[in-house]
Amino acid sequence: MNFEWNERKNEINLDKHGFDFTDAYRVFDLPMVVDLNERDDYGEDRWIGTGMLDGRVVVVVYTEPDELTIRIISLRKALSHERKRYEQYFKN
């Protein structure tokens, strides 16, 4: 799997959320809760994955422009309700 992102967007994300997109691939190495982002019409399917990174529950928003590529849009710490859902999902 190949990962790509807009470097300017990565810089903004790093300043805002403290996460670098270069670490995002590690979230995909572990189980995630994944939902289709239907909040807005982006002209493409955007996915919201909730998973683990360095012992923290995080949310990664991404798209799959083709079968071999994941484009990272955002990476941030999970909100309380997102963390609880993730923990409940993988409780057993």
Residue ranges, per PLM feature:
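Ribonuclease/tRNase effector modules and their secretory precursors
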Residues: 1-92
